[in-house]
Swiss-Prot record:
Name listed for the protein in its UniProt record: ATP-dependent Clp protease proteolytic subunit
UniProt KW keywords: Cytoplasm, Hydrolase, Protease, Serine protease
Active site feature: 98 (nucleophile), 123
Residue stretches in coiled coil: none
Gene Ontology terms: cellular component: cytoplasm; endopeptidase Clp complex
InterPro entries (UniProt xref): ClpP, ClpP/crotonase-like_dom_sf, ClpP/TepA, ClpP_His_AS, ClpP_Ser_AS
Classification via NCBIfam families: clpP, PRK00277.1, PRK12553.1
Source species of the chain: Histophilus somni (strain 2336)
Amino acid sequence: MSVIPMVVEQTSRGERSYDIYSRLLKERVIFLTGEVEDRMANLIVAQLLFLEAEDPAKDINIYINSPGGSVTAGMAIYDTMQFIKPNVRTLCIGQACSMGAFLLAGGTAGKRAALPHARVMIHQPLGGFRGQASDIQIHAQEILKIKQTLNERLAFHTGQSIEQIEQDTDRDNFMSAEQAKLYGLVDDVLIKR
């Protein structure tokens, strides 16, 4: 069981308490933490759409600390980030691995950053399927299509060639914040505000 801190605000109408994440959402900050999965993706997408409706001209900030997870859940978040009008700033706090790194790179160009001791990891998508040989073949073809799509989007966001992305994602590829900047996954390493 996790405890979520509460924040108390004084207003002209008295005190009002919020959980910390709701309070930060008022400041256009979204936390993408933990495994990327369908329920979390739906919450992130809803927050992105809500903030766009509130003010389509104002940046949205996504703080990422994720080991990665589901490709389809991650693509729901990614597609929404690309679809909405506001610029989406991404910031890696802790780690952005696998789909977390993909979402980090998918922020608005020039507005993607990592904290100095953050770790970023890219690799090819993982798959596992059991069943009849024909079904295994279908799933293998699907994961190869997904791999191609992810590589194309990473190449677009980083400026690396598809061939370089394919080589660098063949195995787990861990990077420091500075290495992620040199690679093009982020634009800046933030030391202080």
